[in-house]
Design a protein with these regions (language model features):
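Intrinsic-disorder-associated, low-complexity terminal segments enriched in Asp/Asn/His/Tyr and depleted
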Residues: 15, 27-28
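Negatively charged
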Residues: 36, 40-272
């Protein structure tokens, strides 16, 4: 499912060798201010054919198509992606690396951003500010060659929908999401469906007490090892095939939400 996006005739790019630091030092906005240059806050993504990268920036201006920015040629640029879900269908078959160059980029939705990027191998979203993000379903759905991911360090405290976030990511081996903040997550169905090489997530450290839909969350995760027995699921209602095909996943206590509390009758005799 594709969400609308707008591409512009202007662009620019950084060293998008994913999971490696940029050749530009620090945040572009900060560098500009240190030099006494007043810079507007522009947020955009740049695709460069040089290394098939897609890089997200917060910078004072948007470079021109065909020029060089941070050592790479600008092939295409995308704007206005912060307030709605989007996907770059035109380049989805080419991108091999995704990275966020600057801090201060605060998308309200991440749903389907990289859906079906079939050649994507690495993604570094660590600098993305997801403090106020509310939806992230299908973020890396059907990225079958994705091997490395760095998730936003801010967690996703307001995200209610994470369904199919890593659906079909069959090459992904590990996610460093220990202690990750998914407190508001309600719909987590098929979140890791078919992640057959995934070995560790850190899910056992999560607090997802608001979760309702957990259908097929770890379906087919045959190499995953997670002990979820400590999860407190007070609101769950759906858990069909939660960990089918994932023998290393120890399920939560599904009876927890339905345990009846015995209330003792109040003894009023002492006050009479």
């Amino acid at each position: 499912m594709a969400c609308p996006f707008r591409s512009s005739e202007t662009i620019s790019t950084i060293d998008s060798a994913v999971l490696r630091p940029s050749r530009l030092l620090g945040n572009h906005i900060a560098v500009g201010r240190e030099k006494g240059i007043e810079m507007a806050d522009r947020q955009f993504a740049v695709y460069s054919v040089d290394d098939e990268s897609l890089t997200f920036y917060r910078y004072g201006r948007i470079p021109v198509l065909g020029t060089e920015f941070a050592g790479k040629h600008v092939t295409k640029v995308f704007e206005n992606f912060n307030d709605h879900c989007w996907t770059t269908d035109a380049i989805a078959d080419r991108v091999t690396g995704v990275s966020v160059a600057d801090g201060g980029i605060k998308p309200r939705k991440l749903c389907h951003w990289f859906n079906r990027f079939k050649n994507l191998r690495a993604a570094d979203l660590e600098k993305l500010d997801t403090t106020y993000t509310t939806a992230a379903q299908g973020l890396f759905e059907s990225c079958g060659n994705l091997e490395q991911v760095r998730m936003p360090r801010f967690g996703m405290p307001l995200v209610a929908d994470t369904n199919r976030m890593f659906y079909g990511c069959k090459s992904l081996k590990r996610l460093g999401m220990d202690g990750y903040n998914l407190y508001s997550a309600v719909d987590l169905h098929e979140m890791f469906f078919g992640c057959e090489r995934l070995r560790k997530i850190g899910a056992e450290t999560w607090n997802i007490s608001r979760a309702v839909d957990l259908n097929r969350m770890f379906y087919g995760c045959m190499n995953l090892s997670e002990n979820l027995s400590s999860w407190t699921l007070e609101n769950w209602r759906e858990n069909a095939r939660f960990s089918t095909g994932a023998p290393g996943v120890i399920d939560p206590d599904w009876d927890y939400a339905f345990t009846e509390t015995v209330v003792k009758p109040l003894d009023l005799s002492m006050g009479i």
